[in-house]
Amino acid sequence: MPSNPTRKGRVVVGMSGGVDSSVTAWLLKQQGYEVVGLFMKNWEDDDDSEYCSTRQDLLDAASVADLVGVEFEYVNFAAEYKDRVFAEFLREYSAGRTPNPDVLCNAEIKFKAFLDHAMALGAEHIATGHYARVRTVETPAGPRHQLLKALDDTKDQSYFLHRLNQVQLARTLFPLGELRKTEVRRIAHEIGLHNAAKKDSTGICFIGERPFREFLNRYLPSEPGPILTPEGQRVGTHHGLSFYTLGQRKGLGVGGVKGRQRDDGTAEAWYAARKDLARNVLYVVQGHDHPWLLSAQLQAQDASWIAGEPPAAGAYGAKTRYRQADAACRLDQAGGERFALAFEQAQWAVTPGQSAVLYDGEVCLGGGIII
């Protein structure tokens, strides 16, 4: 790809040390932007932990910035992260819900604290390695910015970005939105990035690769209680309701309990189906398609709409978890901070605390927190 000598302004790229943000920085420099790479440290604890890769990620990001030939800076947002993201994460788990901190991190840290910092550095835009696109359309009220799904639907991250607003989208560039992951890795190899084959990060950002129960146990009290079937039969003891999410199959500790069997005589798998916080009871059911695991509708709160106002009632697509295919649904009401969805086909393991995100084709409209 030839370099474009025409300067397009200053852009600060959030560089994590991974291949996506590294290629993002390179692409923008080739397009003629004055690029500044910024590494964000969002978690202070456990820097010496075997699970924490912050130091190596910082070294990787700095090395890439040097190779690409861009300015590189470091900022510590750990205090903001604990206050705006982690505290809410713990509150949600304490209430028996299963939050998605990456959604909140994007809205509060990567596209708020980071954006403010970048503007203070004299930037006109920020950029990240997210797989998504921004489109600006003219309306009678003026230009409106839309969040679109990425070209690579296997990597599309619009679900995690659905709480962004017009101001944030107006300042944001997503260079990878038109590329497939295979192309990104190919570019990284061609330009000699040492992290071209680096594994994508997985799991919740501040937990990393450590066992989830081990991490959560340090911050929330665990109160064991009964595991019951819908009929009230006790089939085990849970370690604390916070450690379980609806639809969970592994780690329930009820595998040896007899119950429904398949045609071949083997027992059907058990799934976490409901939580009763008042009684500290975890309900489990057998079979992936048990009625307790299926929901024909949902209610959501804390709604956030990218256009600044809710869409009209009507037919849309919705995701209730990342990488789920859009489920045909009807938006029945969207007033204030709440909305309701009715699905054409019942959805599996709709989980309170997760995000319900609404789409009109490739356009992400926004969403809310499932209750």
Swiss-Prot record:
SUPFAM superfamilies: Adenine nucleotide alpha hydrolases-like (SSF52402). PANTHER family: MITOCHONDRIAL TRNA-SPECIFIC 2-THIOURIDYLASE 1, TRNA 5-METHYLAMINOMETHYL-2-THIOURIDYLATE -METHYLTRANSFERASE. GO terms for molecular function: ATP binding; tRNA binding; tRNA-uridine 2-sulfurtransferase activity. Its EC number is 2.8.1.13. NCBIfam families: PRK00143.1 (NF001138), trmU (TIGR00420). The keyword Nucleotide-binding applies. This is tRNA-specific 2-thiouridylase MnmA. The keyword Plastid does not apply. Keywords: ATP-binding, Cytoplasm, Disulfide bond, Nucleotide-binding, RNA-binding, Transferase, tRNA processing, tRNA-binding. It comes from Bordetella pertussis (strain Tohama I / ATCC BAA-589 / NCTC 13251). The lineage of its organism: Bacteria, Pseudomonadati, Pseudomonadota, Betaproteobacteria, Burkholderiales.
